[in-house]
Amino acid sequence: MNKPSLPLKKRGLGRGLEALLGSKGGSSVPPTVAQEQLPGEVLRTLQTTQLQPSKYQPRREMSEAKLAELADSIKAQGVIQPIIVRELDVDMFEIVAGERRWRASQLAGLTEVPVIVRELDDRTVVAMALIENIQREDLNPLEEAQALQRLIDEFSLTHAEAAEAVGRSRAAVSNLLRLLELPLGIRTLLESHQLEMGHARALLTLTPELAAKLAKEAADQGWSVREVEHRAQQFAAGKVPDIRDKKSKSLASAPAQPDIASLETELSERLGTKVAINHGRTGKGKLVIHYTDLDVLDGVLERLRARAVG
């Protein structure tokens, strides 16, 4: 089967699906779950027991902490975005998009959830699941790379075609896919968020043995991306940097780190979602508030508004 041609300069889930599946008879591609239902579609309410996860779901694990955050938001706000499903059998439906909302709704004690039922073939369901997950904000770089590779394998895409489908640059897609070349130990550090994309990119310039050694030290010592880049350059040039030199010690023993961790925990508890504080050596930094979907974001905004009024 020939690969469908990809349209230029299109972004977003629906357009990415057009790129993968092509348009059939001018029909529109199913929209992302953030969009309103299509004309003629009816918002339905189903029992949570009538739904089951999709066999095409690429996410292997779901954070219990984040599910609990979403459950708290659903208790307060309800399920804002309907779950997209397709009918499997009489009174049984497969989740196409929204498995986290379904699981969190059950944690919140709900027995019913809002859904939109669509007629979708397997190929469309695979594409929707993969693209939606790739475009999520909370995926770590390795999960993104694995989902991209599966997308490429499922639809026999080039890197450029995959980039077009998910709204990324070709270079970004190629860089992510290179992470799959890293040794297992480094990939584990990426999955556990002990290393970031920038760290991994620097390590790709080294042999697997040197990369594994430097990755462990970087995770243990809390090195910045710039520090790892510097040391990788030294290794590549044939120099063997002292991993215990003064610069490393100053980075590893920064007194602010325990305080930063404590502040992150306090803010996360107050806002009901993950909060990260990136504190630089100059005293400057940034505060990052994570949210996994609009339900969590609404909960954060409600808490902030309540404190502002109070």
Curated annotation (Swiss-Prot):
One of its GO terms (molecular function) is DNA binding. Keywords: Chromosome partition, DNA-binding. Gene3D superfamilies: 1.10.10.2830, 3.90.1530.30. InterPro entries: Chromosome_partition/occlusion, HTH_ParB/Spo0J, ParB/RepB/Spo0J, ParB/Sulfiredoxin_dom, ParB/Sulfiredoxin_sf, ParB_dimer_C. It holds the Pfam family ParB_dimer. Signal peptide: none annotated. Belongs to the ParB family. GO terms for biological process: chromosome segregation; positive regulation of sporulation resulting in formation of a cellular spore. Involved in chromosome partition. Localize to both poles of the predivisional cell following completion of DNA replication. Binds to the DNA origin of replication. GO terms for cellular component: chromosome. This is Probable chromosome-partitioning protein ParB. It comes from the Bacteria. The keyword DNA-binding applies. The gene is parB.
